[in-house]
Every structure is written in C-alpha cells, then in structure tokens.
Amino acid sequence: MEFEEYSLGDSDEEKEYRQWCLEQTLFLNPLNDLGANSIAAQDILHLGSVSGEESSKIVSCVGFYNQMKQEYVSARYLLYEGLYNHEPHFSDKDVRLENTLDYPVYSFNAEKVRIAMRMAYSLFDKIASFIQYYFDLSHIPSHKLNIGNVWYKSQGRNKLAPAFDGHENWALRGLFWLSKDLEFFSEMYVESSMDPGAKELRDTRNELEHGYLKLHEPMWIGPDAESRLRDDLAISLYRSDFEELSLRSLRKARSALIYLSLAIQQEERVKDENLDDEKLAPMRLGRWEDEWKK
C-alpha cells in the first residue's frame, strides 16, 4: 500500500526522532501499524465524540485521555533521548559515585530510560481509573484498583463485573486480554499470557519501582559468572537488555491507549443509537494548539 509523503519536521533532530518513532511503531496512529510511512507520523488518536447527561463527565473523560496521551509521548521522547544521547550531562558533574568494578551504568541518560519505563507502566492503572469512571463502577476502592482487577467483581477474579459480562465491545476485550500481560499479583495470569516475555517485563518493572535494579555495560561478565564482586542484592541487567524491555513497555502502553480509544468510540456509537438526543449535553471542543504547549 502506497501513501503520499509528508514532512517529518523542520529540523534534522525532529526528523530523526519521528523516523525512529515510525520504525518502532510508536505513534498513536493505526496507520503506523501498516508501516513506517510519513502519513502516520502524528498522534491523531483521540476519544472522538463523548456524550453525557452532564458536561462535567465529558470534560473529565477528554481531559483524562489528553493527560495520558501527553504522558505517553513524553515517555516516548525520554526513551529516545536515553537510547541515543550518550554524551555526559552537566547535571552529573561532580556527583561522587564509587566504582564497584562490575561496569555499572550511572548517568542522566540511563535514568531517562528508567523514567520512560515508569511512565509507560503508570498508564495502565490510570487506564483502569478511566474505565472505572466511564462505566460508573464502584465495586473496587480506588486505592486498590489496577488494570488487572478492574474487570472483576470485588470478591474475586473469577467473575466479571456486570458491566463487562457478555459485553460485545471487541476493543474493550482486547484491552482486557492485554491486561493479562500486566498482572502484578498473580503468577497464573502472567504465565498463561499470550506474551512469552510478560513475566520478565513485569518482574523488571517491579524491581525498578520497588527494589534495586542495576544496569551494566557490555563489558560486564554477566550475572551467572563466578565473581567475588558479585552484587547479590541487585537484580542485574545489561543496559541494552533493559532498553529493549523499556521499549516493549512503551509499545504495550501504546496498544492500551489505542484499545481504550476504540472501546470508548464503540460505546459512544451504541449510546447514540439508544439514547434520546434531548437527554444529551452537546459540547463542542476545539484542539489544543501546538503553540500553547509551553
């Protein structure tokens, strides 16, 4: 399939970044799944028309999705910078660190990759909060809510909540099955995931967030080698392996945001067919222009 060519930006830096996003299939644009074509180099995906008896719900849904999109694209750029900018940064200057002789990685650029993974993973539970709000769910307290349990009745994970039981929304079902890759509290769900690398990704994220994840340069002899300098407390990874895991987490976040957008659009189509127009509160929302993003 051939598409018309479009500009990727004004500067070489912008063009290189957008070309990388295209090649890694990271734009929030379904056309990017068809290939690295310049027509897909824009994050056009949004919720579409959202209706409601109260305008506040419309503003909340659109605003929440806006925020998640902004966090995603920011994580994407941080990952890109962390992967390709290997020049020392002035913020690291005169920060005393000790050499543990196992080729550790300590730098602002490496932290960008760590931050990108944290930001990507934080989107999943925010999506759960969005689902809870949009579908008027109250069976799980907000402080216990996550992408793995939002679908179920409060007493267990073997019965779907009434809002989802038999619900014919294929994008929502896609999001449900994607959540199986992200179960943090059940080995059963992760090990039966369709993604064979789901457990490694989950465990790495948990160690990054709650423990001691140590990155190493390629010269490191590896975690299984006998060494008296072995760091037994750390979960150790080669820098390149962690970078690949961070990229995978960003791709999952992209998929989740796409599924969510398509799911809400389907819900709104059904709502339009079944609700009396007089009960709806029409609300016209314009675009937030690029020059306002300061």
Residue ranges and their predicted role:
Residues M1-V113, E226, N274-A281:
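Charged alpha-helical initiation segments
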Residues E13, K57-S60, F64, E71, ...:
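Alpha-helical structural motif
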Residues K57, F64, D241, L245-K294:
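Long alpha-helical rod scaffolds of large eukaryotic non-enzymatic complex subunits
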Residues C61-F64, M68-N85, A116, A120-L123, ...:
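Amphipathic alpha-helices that form helix-helix packing interfaces
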Residues V95, N99, P141-N158, E226-Y238, ...:
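Eukaryote-specific, cytoplasm-facing alpha-helical/coiled-coil scaffolding segments in long proteins
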Residues E98-R202, H210-G211, E217:
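Short non-catalytic regulatory patches outside canonical folded cores
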Residues E187-E200, T204-I264, E268:
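Charge-enriched, short contiguous segments at helix-coil
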